[in-house]
Amino acid sequence: MNVADFKKLPMLGILRGIELDSVEPLVEVICSNGLKTIEITMNTYGAPELIKKAVSAAKGRLTIGAGTVLSIKDLKEALSAGATFIVSPVLVDDVMKYCLKNKIPVFPGALTPSEIYKAWVSGATMVKVFPAKCFGPEYFKEIKGPFNDIELLACAGVTPENMLEYMACGATAVTFGASVFRKEWLKNKEFGFIGSSIAKYVQNFERGK
């Protein structure tokens, strides 16, 4: 992962619960609607194989990482499959240490000021504030007061409508997941709806620059 490139379009799509035969059409709809960065969560059945297939299908058009990484086992399986960055819902010390030692971008989750600070000084590329929707954009403004140098990734509850507010309040980047990659759309292979939802985020970001 090139972090500087990620910051040019600072949006991360979270894919959870997808099936192997959906990977290729998902990659195509993601690429065609302008999203550049995705994660596939490790608590999805067959996650390493899904990551490997996504990397192959993307042919360099996407930056692909692994999410919900909670152990060294998860981490190594993800990296072997081709993941280039790591995301966790919490700070996992041995995962952090491995990523830092091997210069792998890592986004640990945190919520309270103490957790956010600890994750940052532990070497986080960005700190994933999760679940962001519990406090909203104003929380980011308050956190950035004393911690103005900490880079924050807003996760959970970010919509096309409030995305720019999160960024204005201090989020360096945002995520979206179940609201775009909806279970019913995935089940029915309604990839057009997914593409339209992605496009709303990308277009709103471009308009707000």
Feature roles, as predicted:
Residues 1-81, 101, 160-161, 188-208:
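Conserved N-terminal beta1-alpha1 strand-loop-helix module at the mouth
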Residues 145-207:
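Hydrophobic secondary-structure block in the mid-to-C-terminal portion of proteins
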